[in-house]
């Protein structure tokens, strides 16, 4: 979404649209939706495979992972998981089939195109390690799909499989203030464990607000900015899962 990129934002300054939320798009509904419609009608139907290299943006940072929207039939899901494993990121994070029906991933599912997405870092910066994971992963996936020949495939540890938790287990800011995190990416946390503290601004006599995790899980993303407002997302949690739990054995 070129106008959004120039504005260093997810949403276009032309119409406020987020390209990864408006698929399948409609050319009558503004430039962002028109762009999604072009991709959905003219590009995706010509593809067998697709990749989308994401990061956490300016507001969050992710553990390096491939990210799968768990839609499509059984064979389609298996093909996506195989592509994600070939990519070689340390984790495969899986979201529910209805997590974001307006994403490019969901559109690829609707059209039977095998798509692998990623979350590689974030914070509005370029991290050399994440860049290396992305470059090597693209080459490995292309070799797996038979598009590149003779690409070296170094032995990699099998990625861990994680199912993204719903909002019920996601810590949110309960007040405005400055957030002090108590945990890091990839930490395993327990129900009731402290996630961090929010220090109110302008109310120096008010005690900090402790934020607690509302269930166990593994941290796959965390907020970057210190200043938070009530309702801001602070962490994303995921739970270990195996192929039996995914229903593909």
Q: What role is predicted for each listed range?
A:
Residues 1-249:
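Structured catalytic-domain cores with a bias toward divalent-metal coordination
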């Amino acid at each position: 979404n070129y106008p959004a990129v120039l504005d260093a934002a997810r949403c276009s300054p032309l119409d406020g649209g987020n390209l990864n939320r408006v698929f399948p798009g409609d050319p009558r509904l503004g430039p962002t939706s028109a762009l999604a419609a072009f991709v959905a009608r003219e590009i995706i139907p010509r593809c067998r495979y697709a990749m989308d290299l994401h990061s956490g943006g300016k507001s969050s940072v992710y553990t390096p992972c491939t990210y799968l929207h768990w839609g499509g039939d059984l064979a389609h899901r298996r093909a996506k998981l195989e592509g994600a494993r070939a990519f070689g990121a340390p984790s495969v994070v899986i979201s529910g089939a209805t997590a974001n029906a307006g994403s490019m991933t969901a559109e690829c599912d609707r059209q039977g195109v095998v798509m692998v997405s990623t979350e590689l870092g974030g914070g509005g910066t370029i991290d050399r390690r994440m860049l290396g994971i992305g470059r090597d992963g693209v080459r490995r996936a292309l070799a797996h799909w038979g598009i590149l020949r003779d690409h070296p495939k170094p032995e990699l540890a099998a990625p861990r499989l994680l199912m993204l938790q719903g909002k019920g287990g996601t810590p949110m800011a309960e007040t405005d203030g400055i957030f002090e995190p108590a945990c890091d990416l990839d930490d395993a946390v327990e129900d009731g464990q402290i996630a961090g503290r929010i220090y109110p601004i302008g109310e120096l006599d008010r005690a900090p607000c402790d934020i607690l995790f509302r269930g166990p899980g593994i941290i796959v993303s965390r907020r970057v900015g210190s200043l938070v407002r009530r309702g801001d997302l602070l962490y994303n949690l995921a739970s270990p899962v195996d192929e039996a739990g995914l229903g593909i054995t």
